[in-house]
Amino acid sequence: MSAAAPAPQWLSTTLRWGPAQIPLQSNSRPVLSWTRDCFTAELPAPAGPVAATAAAVVVDDELARRLADACREPVPGTEMPAQSGAAEGMLLVRPVTEVISRRRPVDRSWPELIVFGLAPDGDWYALTTSDPLGPRAGELLARQLVERHLRRAGAATLHAAGAVLDGQAVLFAGDSGCGKTTLAAWAAARLGGYFLSGDKAGAYVSGGTAMAVGLAQPTRFGEGTLRSLLGEQWWQDKLPLPQLNQMMGTDRTGKVAPGPFKVVLSNAELAALGVRAASAAPLAALVIAAAGPAGEAAEVRRVPPGEALALVRPQLRSSWDLLPFGAGESAERRFGSTDGALASVLERVPVLVARWRPGHDDPAGVIMAVRDELS
């Protein structure tokens, strides 16, 4: 009779984000140390109160088994065969494009590899990327830990960009192309503020105060926004080298090719370019950015409280849109934001509508009009 396999020795550390303490466990000391370092490097300190959490994230192999069975093939990078058990603590490594393409086409460049894990409460996590030394390393873990923390706090996740001005956050929500990222970038780069988020942000109530939180998600910037951020014609020379293919539309030299493109930058990279970034701050207002009519000046107005929820509801988003789920089980159903979470925030902050034309109207003028409306 063969001896039983020894039980894995779990190691522990604590990820700290302001007052929040998030325990992390793994049976690999290098993974544990690297994860802690990546999390710390990706997230600047919050600028406001953040509730503490005690739920641990444990690296586990259950999702690895499920994907191996679904693929009917061995998992690259491991010894795990399809449709069989795996050793305790084994990590799954699969090309991320194979995982994401089952849900939707992906235009942006993603890291080549992701390691999946399962927390004790059943939450799935992508725990690392292919290059632990690259600028993308840790962003998935950081984002997911923050999102998990916010879900427990009853946060609403919004399709919104955000900036911090005078110690308070303003979230610019709206459909794609409405200029929300441009407004947030101008507030940070030109008006002495901090960049919070470019496409998705959380809002929740802590101790009676509405809070806005960025989700540690890199932002895609267009040429016009980047020029306004860096303030000169040759802004391309300031961008980090695309060692992880973070630029879309580059030629063989790594420089930006002619034509439309987006550049993907994290908040940490923005800070390296001289644009100050924040993780969280008390929320002052939520602004719905919308296209203004041609030939008319930009307009900012306050929304009556009774109309605010219906106006903001279309901008609610799921916290998770990356990991695979079972047939008929959507990320929105598991992790979607609720009207109750949003209503709790809107009871405490005003909602404004800013109608303007990106590329024609002055972003600084729109932001100053928002400030005037709130004063």
Give each language-model segment a name:
Residues M1-L171, S176, A189-L196, A201-S375:
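A noncatalytic interaction/capping subdomain that flanks phosphate/NTP-handling catalytic cores
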Residues K180:
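Conserved lysine of the Walker
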Residues L183-A184:
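Post-Walker A alpha-helix
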